[in-house]
Amino acid sequence: MKITDLKPKLVWECFDEITKVPRPTHHLDRMKDFLIGWAERHGLKYATDEVGNVVMYCPATPGYENAPTIVLQGHQDMVAEKRGDIEHDFLNDPIKTVVEGDWVRAEGTTLGADNGLGCASAMAVMIDPDLVHGPIEALFTVDEEQGLTGANGLDPAMISGRILLNLDSEEHGMIVIGCAGSMCTIATYPMEEVEAPEGFDWYEVHIDHLKGGHSGMEIHLGRGNANQLLARFLWLAEDEFGTIMLSDFQGGGLPNAIPREAKALVGIPAGNEEAFEKMAEIYSATIHDELRLAEGDTFIFNVAMREKPARMIAEEYVNPLVSTIFGTPNGVQGMSLAVPGLVETSSNLASVHKEGDDKVVITTHQRSSVDSKREEITDRITALYENIGCVVVTNDPSVGWAPNPDSKLLKTAEESFKDLFGYDPKVEALHAGLECGIFLEKMPGMDMISFGPTLKDIHSPNEKAYIPSVEEYWKFLTDLLARLAKQ
């Protein structure tokens, strides 16, 4: 079965078109061209701005021209993650989709349902002749996954509507009314390389096939962080053997993805092969036991002997680096006392990459619904890395979205959901970033909610969309549009 055989047919057909367009974050020229071409083919007016956002304008259903204009919003980009054994060029290759029971997934890569299904449903609304709706402005932003370039650079003159439906949530049955703010902290560790000496045996230490996932939506699940697990082992090895040498460390990827894989090239004093391999065996058993409930038994940790490298990080730089990575705050840092069950503050040790012969770059990603708490955890990490001589920079923080429980839009959405499905939706704030807070700053008075179909394991190659939820999400979206048009 192909995804174009699924219902609602228009949504899946539009999503199928989107999967054929390479669209990793920061590489969206093809997606912009696709959206413009799609609008032209369907006779829709459109506008773009300097950063690459696209807005399509769809007339109201006849008779509803005076209804309030509704903004349907999704983001163009997708997280580009793949399994290590998969050959895939995100800049040129289409996503290969697979229907598997009640789920749609990709072949070894992220699916891009985040936020391709949101974009596809906005497109489907504009070409479905059977729907009732007022004027529609469909806003497709760029670079939501990293940098929020689209939301921050949006020309608000392109948008006249003051009711916005953000289609970028991942749990059907939940209406989101607020989100956390976030920022990245990037530490550059200056170091020197020297010739690798004799007298050491060299090993590649590798951890892979962790679940990873979204560093906001899934940070509370206790999943392993590949960078920290690797640094922990290196720290233990240094403690056991007195000294270790380090030639390379590569781990993680995007700031908002929990790292699934990391590897290092490490030297230990010669003659300790048996002890080192036994230590690795014990460590593997330990972390498998620790992570059994969060990860299952599918991830791997192993060591394999390698040839002596020509160059390595000078010895005096190794201990400060390994100790600091190991000691970096990671995971949930505080729970909300105002909203039971909501993560208030977190940090993700997102990536560690030795670059060239003179530096290691460590990227962490902080989130909090309390600005001062986000600043506090950022300051702690900054102090930690500056203490070993790093140059630390932070990006501009993304704006959180304060909940408005008195929203008229929220009340209408709750009524629609209850009438359709017979139970009340969950109404929550998220420990994840959405563009809504920025929209509210740029377009004061905007009434907003966020919702979407059920997606699992986003930002990882295990990402999948629950097919039955897409149909129910579509019913909810179209019913809500009709109710808003008739108010």
Which stretches of residues belong to each language-model region?
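Active-site-adjacent substrate-binding region
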Residues: 218, 225-249, 391, 395, ...
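His/Asp/Glu-rich mid-to-C-terminal helical/loop segments that flank catalytic regions of hydrolases
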Residues: 223-240, 269-273, 319-326, 333-337, ...
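Acidic/His- and Gly-rich active-site-bordering loop/insert found
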Residues: 2-103
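Acidic, glycine-rich active-site loops and adjacent beta-strand->loop/helix elements
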Residues: 76-78, 110, 139-147, 168-172, ...
